[in-house]
């Protein structure tokens, strides 16, 4: 069997980064995490770094804004995965420049991990946030860097514990607010599974210069189907309040930041159906649960079961 690629994760202590680092280490890839000195003095982040070390991850000290440290780190690996947060997405141009200079990278995964930004019709302010990811994609392609874009749609941990109810901390028990008509399908993926599928793609020629869509059939549900599943689990019918699209668009315009970004993403997801309103063509994409049927993914039903 071919040797597994050495993987460097940048942004590994962030929300989705932790799961990608863990999946990489557990699957036997020599795994490296680029960590800033300041991260080590953060009590929460330093615990995450300790956990990485226990998994056998090599911690490299460096910074996105220090070109030399970046090139030095990149030269030690074969694959770079960026899991940076929204505020740093545009700065991935620095990463692209370092990858180009290092000249040894077999694959780059930019920070995506949401809906396919080339296929969305999101309104502002989500439109501008997605546009940054689009710019990064075009820059990667222009430089001829081999890539995989991971489109995992909704993080289960963001959406399912509250079922997208404003201000809630638990799933609804009495009434539920449903955006649009509730018939549009969205996709919900558990974060460990996102990490697992991402790492499976690292050495897979089928995912080279393609978008890897994580769209397992059991996790592709409309809002109405989600509510019906939850009602069955708790043995109770909820009062349903449907919010028309006009009202959502008005709320996006009048709410204080950062709410409009969240509302605009939810509008694209649950009203426009931007995660499921196109067919995956072999020319641009592949679907993870089809490529890797051996992965026992967490279904939405399994996930919601913890909250009954």
Curated annotation (Swiss-Prot):
Reaction(s) catalysed by this chain's protein: (-)-dehydrodiconiferyl alcohol + NADPH + H(+) = (S)-isodihydrodehydrodiconiferyl alcohol + NADP(+); (+)-dehydrodiconiferyl alcohol + NADPH + H(+) = (R)-isodihydrodehydrodiconiferyl alcohol + NADP(+); (2R,3S)-dihydrodehydrodiconiferyl alcohol + NADPH + H(+) = (S)-tetrahydrodehydrodiconiferyl alcohol + NADP(+); (2S,3R)-dihydrodehydrodiconiferyl alcohol + NADPH + H(+) = (R)-tetrahydrodehydrodiconiferyl alcohol + NADP(+)
Pfam families: NmrA (PF05368)
MF annotations from Gene Ontology: oxidoreductase activity, acting on NAD(P)H, oxygen as acceptor
Positions annotated to bind NADP(+): 11-17, 36, 45, 137
Entry keywords, A to Z: NADP, Oxidoreductase
EC numbers, comma separated: 1.23.1.-
InterPro entries in the cross-refs: NAD(P)-bd_dom_sf, NmrA-like, NmrA-type/Isoflavone_red_sf, PCBER-like
Tissue specificity of this protein: Expressed in flowers. Expressed at low levels in stems.
GO biological process assignments: lignan biosynthetic process
Active site feature: 133
Function: Oxidoreductase involved in lignan biosynthesis. Catalyzes the NADPH-dependent reduction of phenylcoumaran benzylic ethers. Converts dehydrodiconiferyl alcohol (DDC) to isodihydrodehydrodiconiferyl alcohol (IDDDC), and dihydrodehydrodiconiferyl alcohol (DDDC) to tetrahydrodehydrodiconiferyl alcohol (TDDC).
Sequence similarity: Belongs to the NmrA-type oxidoreductase family. Isoflavone reductase subfamily.
PANTHER family in UniProt: ISOFLAVONE REDUCTASE HOMOLOG P3-RELATED (PTHR43349:SF93), PINORESINOL REDUCTASE-RELATED (PTHR43349)
Protein name: Phenylcoumaran benzylic ether reductase TP7
Gene: TP7
């Amino acid at each position: 069997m071919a040797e597994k690629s050495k993987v460097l994760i940048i942004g590994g202590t962030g929300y989705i980064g932790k799961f990608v680092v863990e999946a990489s280490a557990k699957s036997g890839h020599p795994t490296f995490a680029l960590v800033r000195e300041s991260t080590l003095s953060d009590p929460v982040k330093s615990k995450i770094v300790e956990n990485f070390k226990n998994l056998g991850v090599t911690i490299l000290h460096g910074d996105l804004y220090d070109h030399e440290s970046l090139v030095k780190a990149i030269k030690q690996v074969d694959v770079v995965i960026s899991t940076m947060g929204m505020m740093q997405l545009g700065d991935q141009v620095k990463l692209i420049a370092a990858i180009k200079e290092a000249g040894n990278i077999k694959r780059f995964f930019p920070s995506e991990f949401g809906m396919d930004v080339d296929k969305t019709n999101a309104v502002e302010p989500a439109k501008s946030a997605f546009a940054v990811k689009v710019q990064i994609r075009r820059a990667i392609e222009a430089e001829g860097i081999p890539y995989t874009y991971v489109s995992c749609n909704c993080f289960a941990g963001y959406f399912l514990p509250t079922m997208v109810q404003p201000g809630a901390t638990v799933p609804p028990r009495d009434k539920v607010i449903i955006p649009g008509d509730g018939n549009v399908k969205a996709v919900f993926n558990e974060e460990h599974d996102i990490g697992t599928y991402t790492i499976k793609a690292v050495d897979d020629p089928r995912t080279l210069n393609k978008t890897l869509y994580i769209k397992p059939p059991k996790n592709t549900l409309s809002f109405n189907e989600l509510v019906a599943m939850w009602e069955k689990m708790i043995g109770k019918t909820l009062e349903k309040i449907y919010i028309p699209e006009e009202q959502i668009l008005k709320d996006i315009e009048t709410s204080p930041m950062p709410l409009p970004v969240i509302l605009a993403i939810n509008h694209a997801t649950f009203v426009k159906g931007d995660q499921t309103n196109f067919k995956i063509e072999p020319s641009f994409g592949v679907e993870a649960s089809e490529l890797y049927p051996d992965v026992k993914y967490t279904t939405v039903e399994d996930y919601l079961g913890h909250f009954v």
